Swiss-Prot record:
The gene is clpP. Its EC number is 3.4.21.92. This is ATP-dependent Clp protease proteolytic subunit. One of its GO terms (biological process) is protein quality control for misfolded or incompletely synthesized proteins. Pfam families: CLP_protease (PF00574). It comes from Bradyrhizobium sp. (strain BTAi1 / ATCC BAA-1182).
Length: 210
């Protein structure tokens, strides 16, 4: 049975452009990166986070004043990997707009709400889910206790990030994240995870990147 990732990569379209030096071919994602569009797709893990961070840093170096658009369709994943992307979004100079296409769950929802104020969007049929971090451990009792303390510390830090970007109280965030909380795009806007639900690209495309 073929690797589904390999099959997927073989299906990525190529775009051919005419230049003064002849034809140049790009895969579709590289071509969209030229337009300052980044895709956060699939589970959040170290390899994926490294690629996203590299793209953010590259686009900052290319033009530190021009917005970057981040399209998110992710079920979430590793907390530390997601925080690497989050910290880089806050670190770089360009404003980063975020748009949920499909789903933004767990760390995906944190990245969605971490976009620049008034530049956080969702398509109307997307789903957003927030919850507290989870983990399973085995070993000596002392080690299990240390891991539990680290999970609680991460939970507190994630809650603080949601408070910062949603405007909700710490108690409201703590209650919302106690269990899996699924939100429609409209409910996510009311909660402060996004700024607006959009079904058409704005006439002024600047906040979404051209």
């Amino acid at each position: 049975m073929r690797d589904p990732v390999e099959t997927y990569m073989n299906l990525v379209p190529m775009v051919v452009e005419q230049t003064n030096r002849g034809e140049r071919a790009y895969d579709i994602f590289s071509r969209l990166l030229k337009e300052r569009i980044i895709f956060v797709t699939g589970p959040v893990e170290d390899g994926m986070a490294t690629l996203i961070v590299a793209q953010l840093l590259f686009l900052e170096a290319e033009n530190p004043k021009k917005e970057i658009a981040m399209y998110i369709n992710s079920p979430g994943g590793v907390v530390t990997s997601g925080l690497a992307i989050y910290d880089t979004m806050q670190f770089i100079r360009p404003a980063v707009s975020t748009l949920c296409t499909g789903q933004a769950a767990s760390m995906g929802s944190l990245l969605l709400c971490a976009g620049h104020k008034d530049m956080r969007f969702s398509l109307p049929n997307s789903r957003i889910m927030v919850h507290q971090p989870s983990g399973g451990f085995q070993g000596q009792a002392t080690d299990i206790m240390l891991h539990a303390q680290e999970i609680l510390s991460l939970k507190k830090r994630l809650n603080e990030i949601y408070v910062k970007h949603t405007g909700q109280s710490y108690k409201a965030i703590e209650d919302a994240l106690e269990r899996d909380k699924f939100l429609t795009a409209e409910a996510a806007a009311e909660f402060g995870l996004i700024d607006k639900v959009i079904d058409k690209r704005p006439e002024d495309p600047a906040p979404m990147a051209k």
